């Protein structure tokens, strides 16, 4: 991949919430998961676990319990990015949040590069959402869902937003 391709994926990534009725094939899903697992992690602990959901009934149940994930009623795929707390960085257990966030962003960028649309829907730290998602996906108590990522072939093409804000950049000191 060229530098421009990476920067293009970053610049063109948008949250896609409407999807075509077209399944995402297993090889493409595996590419997304490989991208997630290529993320950096504190102490290289790689605490992430991914739950891949393609069954319509389960996708609908996830949409039922998450007020901002209603696009799962339409999406053909959900990747729930979770942390196995047994594999967190020793002495600083909350690094899993950064680790799994990096994995999630890699998935979102890979989706863009593969011609897919995706959107990150936060779960943690909303414990009501954590417990509902944990119940639906039968997660063990040592596993915490950080988010659910709806994925599919986009049925919308929202404009790319320029998010550059120079006033938020501070050189050397604040």
Where is each model-derived feature located?
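Acidic, surface-exposed loops and disordered segments
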Residues: 1-174
